Curated annotation (Swiss-Prot):
It comes from Panax ginseng. Its main location: endoplasmic reticulum. The gene is SS10. It is a multi-pass membrane protein. This is Squalene synthase 10. Induction: Induced methyl jasmonate (MeJA) in adventitious roots. The lineage of its organism: Eukaryota, Viridiplantae, Streptophyta, Embryophyta, Tracheophyta. It holds the Pfam family SQS_PSY. It is an enzyme of class 2 (transferase). InterPro entries: Isoprenoid_synthase_dom_sf, Squ/phyt_synthse, Squal_synth-like, Squalene/phytoene_synthase_CS, Trans_IPPS_euk-type, Trans_IPPS_HH. GO terms for molecular function: squalene synthase [NAD(P)H] activity. Belongs to the phytoene/squalene synthase family.
Amino acid sequence: MGSLGAILKHPEDFYPLLKLKIAARHAEKQIPSEPHWAFCYSMLHKVSRSFGLVIQQLGPQLRDAVCIFYLVLRALDTVEDDTSISTEVKVPILMAFHRHIYDNDWHFSCGTKEYKVLMDEFHHVSNAFLDLGSGYKEAIEDITMRMGAGMAKFICKEVETIDDYDEYCHYVAGLVGLGLSKLFHASGAEDLATDSLSNSMGLFLQKTNIIRDYLEDINEIPKSRMFWPRQIWSKYVDKLEDLKYEENSAKAVQCLNDMVTDALVHAEDCLKYMSDLRGPAIFRFCAIPQIMAIGTLALCFNNTQVFRGVVKMRRGLTAKVIDQTKTMSDVYGAFFDFSCLLKSKVDNNDPNATKTLSRLEAIQKICKNSGALTTKRKSYIIENESGYNSTLIVILFIILAILYAYLSSNLPNSL
């Protein structure tokens, strides 16, 4: 759970954190007994605990398909991300990956930590993939083939223009959106969404990650990973790595705000995509990451810490998003709240201020017109009045900790 200091500062986070912890224990007990499926679900929880939690809400067949889709693409991404692999070796693997998933003898050692285990033991993923229905397999193969080819293209090509940036993000994330839409449709639960809306769902998430991960990517050893488009950063500095130096802070923040403004263009499509979903489990599966994305953009905007260290939503706020996101009204409320936070951080002297404000106002207009912004809803950005007595907070924390320990020890084994 979150640290004691964070919980004392935000006591309203404790109950969502408690529920999240119990849900995580519940999810871990849902791991199937078959060795290949046990490996896949265990690995899913290791590479993405939050994704592992949300996926558990899907129906059994769709859950299995999405689990394998995710692991196949994580494996593909591990090959792409490993800068120690030569281009001559990497490109053919990326191009042929869609065939490797049918071969339960294939594996390729690369990556680190849990990703190395995923690659070394990839036969488990292949065996699970072969268990899926034909509609699911065809969708996964198609997206893997297209993504591998796109990744291979950008191994040999730098991201120069905004069009290049959009194309790269399409290959590595927009195609994930298209693939998930195909899986939802194959399950019979949803109509097939348009490629344009599906693509925007992926691009909004990917661009957020690229913005947030600037420092990690630029410091990658043995070779930097550079995804910010030259068309944007060259307006502010001579080299992309110059953004991390303190003497360039003013220009770096302007460049950062330019990148965030570019990402915001996809928000309206994302709201449309989510509003068309019918199934509550699929809706939550899609909505939670999108709220996390706009929340992360709000934290990153105008924030020099992006160039100094890690910027991410506190764990308690993440737990609140997972706990409170049930309906489209919740999504409209969250997007409105975080767009308000973004708007409050816009400096009128910023060269992109007019464009940024225009995009934020378009998001806010959609949220207001939805009729979902009632006075009774819980806000993500307006903190509770700090009238808490510190002693009472500590007592409350102790009581809730005891309650959590009791609930944890008494969870039925069948959960």
